[in-house]
Curated annotation (Swiss-Prot):
This is Toxin Cll5c*. One of its GO terms (molecular function) is sodium channel inhibitor activity. It is found in: Secreted. Has the structural arrangement of an alpha-helix connected to antiparallel beta-sheets by disulfide bonds (CS-alpha/beta). Beta toxins bind voltage-independently at site-4 of sodium channels (Nav) and shift the voltage of activation toward more negative potentials thereby affecting sodium channel activation and promoting spontaneous and repetitive firing. It comes from Centruroides limpidus (Mexican scorpion).
């Protein structure tokens, strides 16, 4: 019975986990990367305490994160376009 409860809880957390491109809150731009696929830098950024993700990799030259909490913003930010100055 306990194992069924644990499995159900894990599935619910997995289904409700957020994913998306990491975004720089000050510029509104995605975190860039060059090595597509498995990428240590993206994985490290996604797993950082202020992001809270479970896994990150490089997709379309930007860091894509999985398992993010709802509080972590992802690209695009509302009312903020990417401004590279």
């Amino acid at each position: 019975m306990n194992s069924l409860l644990i499995i159900t809880a894990c599935l619910v957390l997995f289904v409700w986990a957020k994913e998306g491109y990491l975004v720089n809150k000050s510029t509104g731009c995605k975190y860039g990367c060059f090595w597509l696929g498995k990428n240590e830098n993206c994985d490290m950024e996604c797993k950082a305490k202020n992001q809270g993700g479970s896994y990150g990799y490089c997709y379309s030259f930007a860091c894509w994160c999985e398992g993010l909490p709802d509080s972590t913003p992802t690209y695009p930010l509302p009312n903020k376009s990417c401004s590279k100055k």
